Amino acid sequence: MEIGNLIRMANRIGQFFEAMPDRQEALEGVANHIHKFWEPRMRNELLGFLDQSPDGDAGTERLHPLVLDAVTQNRQRLTPIARVA
């Protein structure tokens, strides 16, 4: 999936949870949503993008600050577990 599409999807999640009065709860909500509903390959692509662009800036698209913080703080949990054959 193209990174711009993933950023736009993640930003919509961030905009939803931004309305929460408790920032920590909002960060947890973003991370939980991405963990539960994004396929492992989508999470891998987003994490790989952040390896290349830690500020979340893709040039034409930029990660919402809440999403950037949520993914960065929960990177280990969001990293898909490799299956052993």
Predicted regions and their residues:
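Intrinsically disordered, low-complexity, basic-enriched segments
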Residues: 1-85
